[in-house]
């Protein structure tokens, strides 16, 4: 049976934390900042953790991610 491969697009978007969680970056940060407040832009800079409902699905795509 062949090995399960890592989903490369997901591997570029998620990082494993030391405690075993998954860190992600926020959407809506590439353009059109004139419609967003300063507070929104500041909060979009911060990384966030993957929610528990999505964790299992994303973890299965990142089988060999350290």
Swiss-Prot record:
Entry keyword annotation includes Ribosomal protein: yes
Q: Please note every region of biased composition (Basic residues).
A: 1-16
PROSITE patterns documented for this protein = RIBOSOMAL_L35
Query: Pfam families attached here?
Result: Ribosomal_L35p
MF term (GO), any: structural constituent of ribosome
InterPro entries assigned: Ribosomal_bL35, Ribosomal_bL35-like, Ribosomal_bL35_CS, Ribosomal_bL35_sf
> Might you report a single GO cellular component term?
cytosolic large ribosomal subunit
Region of interest (Disordered), ranges: 1-21
Q: Which UniProt keywords apply?
A: Ribonucleoprotein, Ribosomal protein
Q: Name one GO biological process term.
A: translation
Coiled-coil regions listed in the entry:
none
User: So what family is this one in?
Assistant: Belongs to the bacterial ribosomal protein bL35 family.
**Which PANTHER family does UniProt cross-reference here?**
54S RIBOSOMAL PROTEIN BL35M (PTHR33343), LARGE RIBOSOMAL SUBUNIT PROTEIN BL35M (PTHR33343:SF1)
Put simply, this protein is called Large ribosomal subunit protein bL35
Encoding gene, per UniProt annotation: rpmI
């Amino acid at each position: 049976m062949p090995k399960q491969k890592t989903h490369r697009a997901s591997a570029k978007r998620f990082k494993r934390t030391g405690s075993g969680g998954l860190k992600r970056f926020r959407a809506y940060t590439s353009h059109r900042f004139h419609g967003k407040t300063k507070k929104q832009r500041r909060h979009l800079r911060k990384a966030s953790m993957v929610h528990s409902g999505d964790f299992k699905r994303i973890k299965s795509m990142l089988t060999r991610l350290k």
